[in-house]
Amino acid sequence: MMASSDSAAPLPPAALAAFLRGCERRGAVFAELQCGDTDRGDVALAAALRAFRGNAAALPMADWPVRFWSLLAATPQLRADGAHAHWSGSLAALAAPAPADRAALLLRLAGGLQEAEAAEALGIDGPAYRDALARACPRDATGQPDAAGWRALAEAIQQHLR
């Protein structure tokens, strides 16, 4: 009996479906909060899901998370604020950062990615990612990073995920 060593064998559709189920809600929240518009975020998510489904089988499963998030972050709808962008209440701090910096923050807080994965998804190195994250961090009245503001924003995003 010969064991198959073909690593290019097609992945079972169940593996792809399970992966997408696991990241779809986080992706929807990331997209909405990145552009400040639910409808625009839904369009971006749908485009990223289509693109991901089209090439996932050619990738090792270990590469799927970074590939999915990089496709989503690169959609045109999420690279600039739309005309109807709005962040209110406990999410109002998301209006201040530039879109690229906001993406760094949201990959961490909504996407749940670690630093290295988030940097790779954005196509930047670790120091550039940390700089973007620092720029996106809520600030206090003196312009210093606001730890309480960061915690409040992180909690608001977690509530939004639920």
Label each PLM-derived region with a short phrase.
Residues E24-E32, D42-A83, S90-L91, L133:
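Σ70-family region 2.3-2.4 aromatic/basic alpha-helix that recognizes the −10 promoter
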Residues D37, Q114, I124-A128:
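Helix-turn-helix DNA-binding motif, specifically the short coil turn and the N-cap/start of the second
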Residues S88-A98, E120, D125, D140:
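Short amphipathic alpha-helical boundary/capping segments
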Residues L122-Q158:
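DNA-recognition helix of helix-turn-helix
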Residues M1-S7, E155-R162:
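Extreme N-terminal regulatory/targeting segments of RNA polymerase sigma factors
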